[in-house]
């Protein structure tokens, strides 16, 4: 069975040749596999490990047109991302430092003007991936959940405080 046939069989409640698999590999894992297993640099790591599902994601950020690099040197990079946050990443580090969020004060929520959900740039990578994968894999779409996406707008500590102190605002924000 191909990956697509395997997933479709499972979704149709027919027995596949094996249980369909999915994983999400970090960039560092991919690089380690290339080095330690002697794989070619252009290896499709999902295909190599028999992953049966591909995930296509459109740009779900509220402000994709406002992203910009604010500062960059050999050690760190500071950007305004599509969530309106200012975040700093460090070379060879997976996590980031959040320096600023879009909804600093509760009143900021009423002043936000999101970019159109119909912007072509939101879907360019999504459409390219679906087209590339659809013949061989089952392609699933995803969006992020309300908790993480809300923390991106408000900041995690602020949002958790809002949940406890002002549940009505937290609901409006999420």
Set out the residue ranges of the language-model regions:
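Catalytic cores of TIM-barrel enzymes
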Residues: 1-174
């Amino acid at each position: 069975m191909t990956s697509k046939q395997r997933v479709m069989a499972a979704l149709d409640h027919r027995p596949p040749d094996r249980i369909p698999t999915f994983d999400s590999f970090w960039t560092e894992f991919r690089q380690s596999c290339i080095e330690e297993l002697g794989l070619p640099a252009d290896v499709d790591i999902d295909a190599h490990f028999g992953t049966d599902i591909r995930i296509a994601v459109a740009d779900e950020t509220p402000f994709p047109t406002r992203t910009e690099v604010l500062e960059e040197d050999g050690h760190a990079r500071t950007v305004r991302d599509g969530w309106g946050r200012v975040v700093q990443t460090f070379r060879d580090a997976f996590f980031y430092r959040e320096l600023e969020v879009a909804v600093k004060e509760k009143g900021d929520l009423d002043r936000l003007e999101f970019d159109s959900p119909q912007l072509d740039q939101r879907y360019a990578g999504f459409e390219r991936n679906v087209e590339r994968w659809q013949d061989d894999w089952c392609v699933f779409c995803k969006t992020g959940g309300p908790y993480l996406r809300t923390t991106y707008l408000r900041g995690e500590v602020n949002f958790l405080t809002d949940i406890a102190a002002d549940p009505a605002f937290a609901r409006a924000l999420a």
